Amino acid sequence: LTCLICPEKYCNKVHTCRNGENQCFKRFNERKLLGKRYTRGCAATCPEAKPREIVECCTTDRCNK
């Protein structure tokens, strides 16, 4: 599985996940409309969202756009 890993909205940096990491995730704060920063990467399980945070998980290559 390969996941995107950069914080910008439009991301092209790809990372190959390790064994056991079978999900890509994207995490961001729902309140910041301008200058939104994303946390992207690989995970074994979908990370839990903190208050006012959105976490999206998926299981195909580069799906965490």
Swiss-Prot record:
Transmembrane segments annotated in the record for this chain: none
Keywords attached to this entry: Disulfide bond, Secreted, Toxin
UniProt cross-references to CDD domains, sorted A to Z: TFP_snake_toxin
Database matches in PROSITE patterns: SNAKE_TOXIN
Localization: Secreted
SS bond partners: C3-C24, C6-C11, C17-C42, C46-C57, C58-C63
Tissue expression as described in the entry: Expressed by the venom gland.
InterPro entries documented for this protein: Snake_3FTx, Snake_toxin-like_sf, Snake_toxin_con_site, Toxin_cobra-type
Principal subcellular localisation of the protein: secreted
Entry GO terms, CC: extracellular region
GO molecular function: toxin activity
Listed Pfam families: Toxin_cobra-type
Keyword Cell wall biogenesis/degradation in record: no
Gene3D superfamilies reported for this sequence: CD59
Highest taxon, organism lineage: Eukaryota
Task performed by this protein: Binds with low affinity to muscular (alpha-1-beta-1-delta-epsilon/CHRNA1-CHRNB1-CHRND-CHRNE) and very low affinity to neuronal (alpha-7/CHRNA7) nicotinic acetylcholine receptor (nAChR).
The family this protein is said to belong to: Belongs to the three-finger toxin family. Ancestral subfamily. Orphan group II sub-subfamily.
Protein name, UniProt field: Weak toxin CM-11
